[in-house]
């Protein structure tokens, strides 16, 4: 009897671990492994890290979790097809994994602009079932949907909700930066008319944006206003983590000029170009008591000029103009250490260098302006017709980049070598759905192109660059170009001004020289507010060549003026009073 009992106990000892193992296995299938719970937390690694884990992991549940983490991060890296591929591989998910998958799918829909689908997917998710990290992702998707609909205020409100569930400082900073970007891109009138409805955080953001916009061109006042705001909203998220764009204002010092070095080619074949720019620069600074030292870059090397300027105690330089000299500085930034430099050109090698900005009349500015203008005019399938040369390639690249930002697709680009190629380029590039054409051509070529387009589709919206604007355009030519729009510098808006008539006479009505004069004029405006321009986000200068602002690497960006041929005359379009009469010569 005793032996039988002992055998029974031995059997229990043998089977008990097995039973426990099966029980635990059942719990894992039902509840998921402890690693699955990591889906409730932030995914802080790169997609490459999670993809490597997928390749190394044998456990099926953990493998599914790593695929979800990889897909989540791939969406934030804008690698949507890869994310979708990992989601498609998932099988036999537990409840925690299904929940996280639904969040990722909603995020993908929002990124793709499928707003209704994303909203429906979110409606199936119960907020109470989400962890704080997952709730922050939920509201990020809500914000993205609102952004897709150009409803910045709703996007900001969602970002405020998102902030409540963020614990990581870096993520909070990123969220504040994005909230601030939305505020900066919202029309001032919309901000002023938005009711915070008792939401103290929203009220703080709106007030911050309004104060910033109101004091943008008064830097000293702006800094004091920001300090006052922080005292009024001491517990606000932005008071603890000021948007990155605003953090540099604490060290801002107003521009003070005593001596300036102006570097231009003033002899040889480029003398006329250099002298015209200098004339504009001199006219702009006429009322300022600042000593200007002029250096001829055709007689001295750029290294010699910089060394000479330093010996003379000059710490601010305008120039050089020639690209090879700009490249010398770009490749040897130590040359201009401790100097403020406004280069009057840019090159493909241009990069961010402390206290250096690049300014020039580049075709990229016009191409980007054209893409934005066509988008605003509801053009969605444009054809871009450009010459097969450096100008054409630069224009095409800049237009395509801007179009991708606006619509997420490439623009249809067609090149031509000579006038005889234009007819073929147009017929091969146009489709029934094409609704606008951007043309880079001279005045004569433009007329020929328009004649072809009028025969193919007279309803197309036509746009051109300043290259086609010529003083030789008579009434008949202007009438033929009726309704065509083109970009140019705002200096051409008022031909009756004393300044215009003076420069018209000085340059013998040569438009290319008038552009250079305007560039020289604006070079003074820029260097005279150089610190403000570089350090205050959104700071703009209304110049003769456009509304000037600092872009990436401190490339000076120009907001162009658009004109239109109407019944033999030319009118500026982006003015409040479009009835301004510009040209009507008989």
UniProtKB/Swiss-Prot annotation:
A lipid is attached at residue 27 (S-diacylglycerol cysteine). GO terms for biological process: peptidoglycan biosynthetic process; regulation of cell shape. Keywords: Cell outer membrane, Cell shape, Lipoprotein, Membrane, Palmitate, Peptidoglycan synthesis, Signal. CDD domains: PBP1_YraM_LppC_lipoprotein-like. Regulator of peptidoglycan synthesis that is essential for the function of penicillin-binding protein 1A (PBP1a). GO terms for cellular component: periplasmic side of cell outer membrane. Residues 1-26 form the signal peptide. It is a lipid-anchor. The gene is lpoA. A lipid is attached at residue 27 (N-palmitoyl cysteine). Its main location: membrane. This is Penicillin-binding protein activator LpoA. One of its GO terms (molecular function) is enzyme regulator activity. Interacts with PBP1a. PANTHER family: PENICILLIN-BINDING PROTEIN ACTIVATOR LPOA. InterPro entries: LpoA (IPR007443), Peripla_BP_I (IPR028082), TPR-like_helical_dom_sf (IPR011990). It is found in: Cell outer membrane. Belongs to the LpoA family. Pfam families: LppC (PF04348).
């Amino acid at each position: 009897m005793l032996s039988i009992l002992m055998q029974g106990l031995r059997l229990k000892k043998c089977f008990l671990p097995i039973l426990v193992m099966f029980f635990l296995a059942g719990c894992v299938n039902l509840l998921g492994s402890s690693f699955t719970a990591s889906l409730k937390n932030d995914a802080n690694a790169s997609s490459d890290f999670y993809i490597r884990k997928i390749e190394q992991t044998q456990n099926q549940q953990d493998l599914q979790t790593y695929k979800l983490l990889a897909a989540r991060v791939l969406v934030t890296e804008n690698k949507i097809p890869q994310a979708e591929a990992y989601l498609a591989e998932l099988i036999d998910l537990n409840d925690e994994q299904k929940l996280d998958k639904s969040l990722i799918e909603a995020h993908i829909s929002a990124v793709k602009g499928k707003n209704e689908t994303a909203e429906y997917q979110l409606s199936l998710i119960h907020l109470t079932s989400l962890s704080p990290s997952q709730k922050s992702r939920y509201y990020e998707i809500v914000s993205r949907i609102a952004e897709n609909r150009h409803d910045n205020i709703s996007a900001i409100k969602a970002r405020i909700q998102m902030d409540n569930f963020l614990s990581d400082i870096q993520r909070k900073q990123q969220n504040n930066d994005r909230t601030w970007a939305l505020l900066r891109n919202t029309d001032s009138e919309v901000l002023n008319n938005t009711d915070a409805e008792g939401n103290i955080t929203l009220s703080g953001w709106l007030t911050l944006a309004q104060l910033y916009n109101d004091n943008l061109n008064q830097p000293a006042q702006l800094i004091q206003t920001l300090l006052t705001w922080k005292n009024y909203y001491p517990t606000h998220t932005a008071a603890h983590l000021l948007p990155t764009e605003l953090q540099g204002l604490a060290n801002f010092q107003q521009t003070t000029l005593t001596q300036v070095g102006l570097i231009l080619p003033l002899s040889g074949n480029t003398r006329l170009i250099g002298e015209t720019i200098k004339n504009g620069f001199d006219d702009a600074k006429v009322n300022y008591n600042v000593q200007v030292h002029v250096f001829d870059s055709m007689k001295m090397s750029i290294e010699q000029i910089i060394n000479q300027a330093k010996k003379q105690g000059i710490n601010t330089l305008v120039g050089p103009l020639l690209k090879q000299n700009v490249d010398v500085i770009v490749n040897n930034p130590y040359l201009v250490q401790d100097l403020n430099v406004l280069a009057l050109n840019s090159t493909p090698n241009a990069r961010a260098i402390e206290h250096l900005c690049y300014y020039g009349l580049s075709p990229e500015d016009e191409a980007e302006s054209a893409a934005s203008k066509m988008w605003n005019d509801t053009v969605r399938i444009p054809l871009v017709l450009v010459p097969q040369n450096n100008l054409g390639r630069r224009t095409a690249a800049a237009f395509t980049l801007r179009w991708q930002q606006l619509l997420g697709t490439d623009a249809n680009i067609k090149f031509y070598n000579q006038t005889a190629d234009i007819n073929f380029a147009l017929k091969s590039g146009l489709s029934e759905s094409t609704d606008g054409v951007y043309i880079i051509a001279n005045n004569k070529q433009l007329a020929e192109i328009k004649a072809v387009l009028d025969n193919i589709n007279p309803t197309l919206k036509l746009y051109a660059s300043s290259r086609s604007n010529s003083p030789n355009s008579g009434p008949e030519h202007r009438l033929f170009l009726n309704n065509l729009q083109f970009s140019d510098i705002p200096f051409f808006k008022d031909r009756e001004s004393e300044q215009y008539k003076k420069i018209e006479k000085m340059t013998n009505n040569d438009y290319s020289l008038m552009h250079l004069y305007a560039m020289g004029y604006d070079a003074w405006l820029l260097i005279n507010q150089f610190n403000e321009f570089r350090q205050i986000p959104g700071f703009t200068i209304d110049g003769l060549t456009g509304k000037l602002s600092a872009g990436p690497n401190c490339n000076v960006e120009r907001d162009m003026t658009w004109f239109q041929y109407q019944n033999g005359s030319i009118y500026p379009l982006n003015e409040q009073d479009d009835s301004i009469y510009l040209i009507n010569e008989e």
